[in-house]
From Swiss-Prot:
InterPro entries: YOR389W-like (IPR038921). PANTHER family: ENTEROTOXIN (PTHR35204:SF1), YALI0A21131P (PTHR35204). This is Putative uncharacterized protein YPL278C. It comes from the Eukaryota.
Length: 100
Protein backbone atom coordinates (compact mmCIF):
# COMPACT_ATOMS: atom_id res chain seq x y z
CA UNK A 1 0.00 0.00 0.00
CA UNK A 2 1.14 3.52 -0.69
CA UNK A 3 1.00 6.14 2.02
CA UNK A 4 -2.24 7.57 0.62
CA UNK A 5 -4.04 4.25 0.09
CA UNK A 6 -5.94 2.73 2.97
CA UNK A 7 -7.32 -0.76 3.27
CA UNK A 8 -10.77 0.83 3.10
CA UNK A 9 -9.88 2.31 -0.32
CA UNK A 10 -8.68 -1.08 -1.53
CA UNK A 11 -11.87 -2.77 -0.34
CA UNK A 12 -13.96 -0.15 -2.17
CA UNK A 13 -11.92 -0.70 -5.36
CA UNK A 14 -12.42 -4.46 -5.18
CA UNK A 15 -16.15 -4.05 -4.54
CA UNK A 16 -16.46 -1.67 -7.50
CA UNK A 17 -14.58 -4.07 -9.79
CA UNK A 18 -16.70 -7.01 -8.60
CA UNK A 19 -19.91 -5.05 -9.22
CA UNK A 20 -18.73 -4.07 -12.71
CA UNK A 21 -17.86 -7.67 -13.60
CA UNK A 22 -21.16 -8.97 -12.18
CA UNK A 23 -23.03 -6.39 -14.29
CA UNK A 24 -21.14 -7.45 -17.42
CA UNK A 25 -21.84 -11.14 -16.77
CA UNK A 26 -25.54 -10.37 -16.29
CA UNK A 27 -25.84 -8.17 -19.39
CA UNK A 28 -24.10 -10.79 -21.55
CA UNK A 29 -26.36 -13.50 -20.15
CA UNK A 30 -23.42 -15.58 -19.00
CA UNK A 31 -23.86 -18.25 -16.40
CA UNK A 32 -22.46 -17.85 -12.92
CA UNK A 33 -18.82 -18.71 -12.53
CA UNK A 34 -19.62 -21.31 -9.90
CA UNK A 35 -21.98 -23.19 -12.20
CA UNK A 36 -23.76 -26.42 -11.38
CA UNK A 37 -26.42 -28.54 -12.97
CA UNK A 38 -29.90 -28.21 -11.46
CA UNK A 39 -29.63 -31.74 -10.14
CA UNK A 40 -26.59 -33.57 -8.87
CA UNK A 41 -25.26 -35.66 -11.73
CA UNK A 42 -25.03 -39.42 -11.28
CA UNK A 43 -21.67 -41.10 -10.80
CA UNK A 44 -21.45 -41.85 -14.54
CA UNK A 45 -22.41 -38.33 -15.69
CA UNK A 46 -20.77 -34.92 -15.98
CA UNK A 47 -22.37 -31.49 -15.85
CA UNK A 48 -22.27 -30.28 -19.47
CA UNK A 49 -22.02 -26.58 -20.31
CA UNK A 50 -23.54 -25.95 -23.76
CA UNK A 51 -21.29 -23.81 -25.97
CA UNK A 52 -20.58 -22.83 -29.56
CA UNK A 53 -18.18 -24.64 -31.81
CA UNK A 54 -16.97 -28.21 -31.64
CA UNK A 55 -18.25 -30.12 -28.68
CA UNK A 56 -18.19 -33.70 -27.48
CA UNK A 57 -21.73 -34.02 -28.84
CA UNK A 58 -20.93 -32.85 -32.38
CA UNK A 59 -21.21 -29.47 -34.06
CA UNK A 60 -24.18 -27.85 -35.77
CA UNK A 61 -23.83 -26.28 -39.20
CA UNK A 62 -23.67 -22.46 -39.21
CA UNK A 63 -27.00 -21.01 -40.35
CA UNK A 64 -28.76 -24.31 -39.70
CA UNK A 65 -32.22 -24.54 -38.19
CA UNK A 66 -31.43 -28.07 -36.97
CA UNK A 67 -31.03 -28.13 -33.23
CA UNK A 68 -27.91 -29.78 -31.92
CA UNK A 69 -27.16 -30.98 -28.43
CA UNK A 70 -27.21 -27.94 -26.15
CA UNK A 71 -28.82 -25.58 -28.70
CA UNK A 72 -32.30 -24.64 -29.88
CA UNK A 73 -33.74 -22.57 -32.72
CA UNK A 74 -35.00 -19.19 -31.52
CA UNK A 75 -37.89 -18.04 -33.73
CA UNK A 76 -37.57 -14.38 -32.71
CA UNK A 77 -33.87 -14.26 -33.61
CA UNK A 78 -34.18 -16.70 -36.52
CA UNK A 79 -31.05 -18.55 -35.50
CA UNK A 80 -29.69 -21.24 -33.24
CA UNK A 81 -28.90 -20.14 -29.71
CA UNK A 82 -27.19 -21.89 -26.83
CA UNK A 83 -29.39 -23.37 -24.12
CA UNK A 84 -28.84 -21.56 -20.85
CA UNK A 85 -29.44 -24.61 -18.66
CA UNK A 86 -26.58 -26.90 -17.84
CA UNK A 87 -27.41 -30.55 -18.09
CA UNK A 88 -26.04 -33.84 -16.84
CA UNK A 89 -24.77 -36.02 -19.65
CA UNK A 90 -23.81 -39.67 -19.45
CA UNK A 91 -20.16 -40.54 -20.05
CA UNK A 92 -21.21 -43.32 -22.46
CA UNK A 93 -23.05 -40.75 -24.62
CA UNK A 94 -19.88 -38.67 -24.75
CA UNK A 95 -17.84 -41.69 -25.83
CA UNK A 96 -20.33 -42.66 -28.56
CA UNK A 97 -20.34 -39.12 -29.99
CA UNK A 98 -16.64 -38.31 -29.64
CA UNK A 99 -15.90 -38.63 -33.38
CA UNK A 100 -18.70 -36.31 -34.57
Amino acid sequence: MTDNTTSSDLIKNVETARSTIDGLIESLGWIELNYRCERQCNWDEVCYTPSWGPSPMGMTEPGSHNEGFGTHFDESRQRLVINSKLQCININDLMVNRNH
